[in-house]
Amino acid sequence: MSMNELAVNIPLEHMSNVFGQFDVYIRKIEKTLGVTVIVRDDQLKIIGNEANIKAASEVFTQLYELSRRGNVITEQNVNYALSLLAEKKETSLVEIDK
């Protein structure tokens, strides 16, 4: 199986909110989606198969958008974003927050 990489930018001021205390949300996303996430400065490098890195990128992008809007990210937000992906729902976490 071929491994791919995708870079996602998350501004430094949102990282602790998006990643959770001690990066707990990163670990949850890694475990659930079977990817590896490496953080360097304001960039995430997501490594895995193409479908999984795309899914992880979507989750991180949604969490960042919530953070940018001033929300405190919770484990429930992460779980919900992951469940929307699993159910292949067209609705995003960000749309629900409107």
Label every model-predicted segment.
Residues 1-17:
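Short glycine-/aliphatic-rich beta-strand segments at the starts of folded cytosolic domains
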Residues 3, 18-22, 39:
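A positional/architectural concept
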Residues 9, 20, 50:
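Conserved residues at beta->alpha junctions
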Residues 13-33:
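Short amphipathic alpha-helix segments
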Residues 38-97:
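Interdomain "pre-motor" coupling segment immediately N-terminal to P-loop NTPase/helicase cores
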